[in-house]
Amino acid sequence: YLFAYFTGNNITQEAIRFALSDDGLVYKALNNDQPIISSAAISNTGGVRDPHILRGNDGLYYMVATDMVSANGWNSNRGIVLLKSSDLTNWTSAKINFPTTFPTQFGSVDRVWAPQTIYDASVGKYMVYMSIRKGSSDYDKVYYAYANSTFTGLEAAPQLLFDNSGLSTIDADIIEKDGQFHLFFKTEGNGNGIKKAVSNSLTSGYVLLDKYLDQNSNAVEGGCVFRLYNTDDYVLMYDVYSSGYYEFTKSQD
């Protein structure tokens, strides 16, 4: 199991690191816990956060991250970074500034957070989804767009994927099981825990399951769900960010 992560809010910590695990639960940092690629070389801001990595159907590796330095303020980021590799060592990268690229739809954005990628088999494309806020009068919602064939940009302006009825939603993570798509997310500023919505379609129709799924009374974020190899167990991991550790929970459904 490969875990992509960043370590904190200092600019030296806002960089992509890797860790490995044999069991999906206990991880060992690689490269002496140092970044595997320079944030300054791949981003507009000089820092990257919230990395997510996907092994594609084509055998390549796709990674996305928030282009942000938190010292500039939590409402300061305007885009994301896309990366692609065949060997997990050598990466090509591209930056997307949303106000510049999509001025009509996203000219006023002040948060483009926690992008992730999933393969949409129905169209044979990689879908990138993230939370976006269009300025201080808006709240965070989940949007999606398809990456272009070279994974250097988006085919079109992102479309709305999930709106939690006026409540901010960040850190979306989608997994498919038995033909259904489960969208896990953080209830940002309104409970600060992990809930999910479910749909029969990847790109529409998500219905909220209105209960918290994390097993912690503290605020958590950055949820990620994956299946343990050769088992029926699924792990929901999340960042107990006020206490500086990750927690892992298991489920079979």
Task: Walk through the language-model features, giving the residues of each.
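Carbohydrate-active catalytic/glycan-binding domains of CAZyme proteins
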Residues: 1-253
